[in-house]
C-alpha cells in the first residue's frame, strides 16, 4: 500500500490505521475534506521539506517567488507537483495564473531543458541534493518540516481493543526507529578509583550505566549512547582508565505486542484476518 493513497483508504474504512506523510495528508484534506481520519502519533523519522523550485538555466535571475512573479507577469504558468491541491492553493495565494499537473516520473524532470514541461515545481526534499544535481534552484518554502505520521480511522478508535493494538504498534515502531541511532558502548575498568571517576563523569552527563563486577577486580560498564557521540566519548573514557572499549548496535527486543493481540484491518503490514476475495487487500 503506497502512502499516497493511505489517507483515502483509512477515510473509507478499508483499514484502521497506517503510515503516511503530513504533506500527503494535507493534500487529501484539501481535495476531499477527510472527516474520519486523524493523526494518532508523529513518528520520529527525519523530517523533509516541501519546496518550490525553478530551473536555473531557464530562470537564471530568479531567486525568490517574488522574482518569479515579476518575470512571468500575468502569463499562464505550469506547475508540476505530486501534491496538486497544495500547489493550487499556493498558486492562488501568490496570484499565479497557473495550470497544475501531476508529473509522470520524477518531478524535477519536468524542469529539464530544452523543452521543460513546467515553469516551477513543488516537491519534497530532504537536503536539496537531487534538485541541485538537476540544476534546480529552491525559491520558496511551502512546508518547513514534513513528518511521517501514523493515521487512524476515528471509528476504529472507538473500539478499545483496536485502539490498544494501534497504540502498542506505534510504541514499537518508535522504539525501533529511535534505536537506529543508538549503540551499546562497553568497556572494562580494572582500577576501582578510575571506576568511581568514570561513573561520576557518566552520571553527570546524563548516562545511567550498568556496572558488572569482574572476576579479578574492577568492573565492566555498559551504556546506551547516540552513535554521533561515540567518537567524542571514547578518548575521554580511555583517558580516565577504561580498557577493551567496544560498541555494538542496539537490538530492539521486538515484542510485537500488536501482532500478539487480535488482528485488525491495518494497512501497513501486520498479520490480519479478512476474506481473501477482498479487492482492497
Swiss-Prot record:
InterPro entries: ATP_PRibTrfase_cat, ATP_PRibTrfase_HisG, HisG_C. Pathway: Amino-acid biosynthesis; L-histidine biosynthesis; L-histidine from 5-phospho-alpha-D-ribose 1-diphosphate: step 1/9. Its EC number is 2.4.2.17. Its cofactor is Mg(2+). GO terms for molecular function: ATP binding; ATP phosphoribosyltransferase activity; magnesium ion binding. NCBIfam families: hisG (TIGR00070), HisG_C-term (TIGR03455). Catalyzes the condensation of ATP and 5-phosphoribose 1-diphosphate to form N'-(5'-phosphoribosyl)-ATP (PR-ATP). Has a crucial role in the pathway because the rate of histidine biosynthesis seems to be controlled primarily by regulation of HisG enzymatic activity. Keywords: Amino-acid biosynthesis, ATP-binding, Cytoplasm, Glycosyltransferase, Histidine biosynthesis, Magnesium, Metal-binding, Nucleotide-binding, Transferase. This is ATP phosphoribosyltransferase. It catalyses: 1-(5-phospho-beta-D-ribosyl)-ATP + diphosphate = 5-phospho-alpha-D-ribose 1-diphosphate + ATP.
Amino acid at each position: 500500500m503506497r502512502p499516497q493513497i493511505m489517507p483515502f483508504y483509512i477515510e473509507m474504512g478499508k483499514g484502521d490505521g497506517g503510515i503516511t506523510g503530513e504533506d500527503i495528508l494535507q493534500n487529501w484534506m484539501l481535495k476531499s475534506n477527510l472527516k474520519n481520519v486523524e493523526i494518532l502519533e508523529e513518528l520520529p523519522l527525519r523530517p523533509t521539506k516541501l519546496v518550490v523550485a525553478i530551473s536555473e538555466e531557464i530562470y537564471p535571475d530568479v531567486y525568490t517567488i517574488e522574482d518569479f512573479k515579476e518575470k512571468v507577469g500575468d502569463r499562464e504558468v505550469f506547475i508540476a507537483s505530486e501534491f496538486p491541491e497544495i500547489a493550487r492553493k499556493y498558486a492562488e495565494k501568490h496570484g499565479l495564473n497557473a495550470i497544475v499537473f501531476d508529473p509522470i516520473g520524477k518531478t524535477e524532470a519536468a524542469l529539464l531543458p530544452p523543452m521543460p514541461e513546467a515553469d516551477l515545481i513543488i516537491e519534497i526534499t530532504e537536503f536539496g541534493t537531487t534538485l541541485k544535481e538537476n540544476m534546480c534552484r529552491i525559491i520558496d518554502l511551502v512546508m518547513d518540516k514534513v513528518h511521517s505520521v501514523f493515521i487512524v480511522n476515528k471509528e476504529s478508535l472507538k473500539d478499545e481493543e483496536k485502539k490498544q493494538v494501534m497504540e502498542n504498534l506505534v510504541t514499537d515502531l518508535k522504539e525501533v526507529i529511535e534505536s537506529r541511532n543508538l549503540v551499546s558502548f562497553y568497556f572494562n575498568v580494572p582500577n576501582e578509583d578510575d571506576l568511581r571517576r568514570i561513573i561520576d563523569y557518566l552520571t553527570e552527563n546524563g548516562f545511567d550505566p550498568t556496572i558488572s563486577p569482574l572476576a579479578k577486580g574492577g568492573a565492566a560498564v555498559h551504556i546506551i549512547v547516540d552513535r554521533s557521540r561515540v567518537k567524542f566519548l571514547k578518548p575521554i573514557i580511555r583517558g580516565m582508565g577504561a580498557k577493551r572499549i567496544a560498541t555494538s548496535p542496539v537490538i530492539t527486543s521486538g515484542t510485537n505486542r500488536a501482532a500478539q493481540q487480535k488482528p485488525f484491518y491495518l494497512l501497513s503490514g501486520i498479520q490480519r484476518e479478512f476474506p481473501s476475495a477482498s479487492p482492497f487487500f
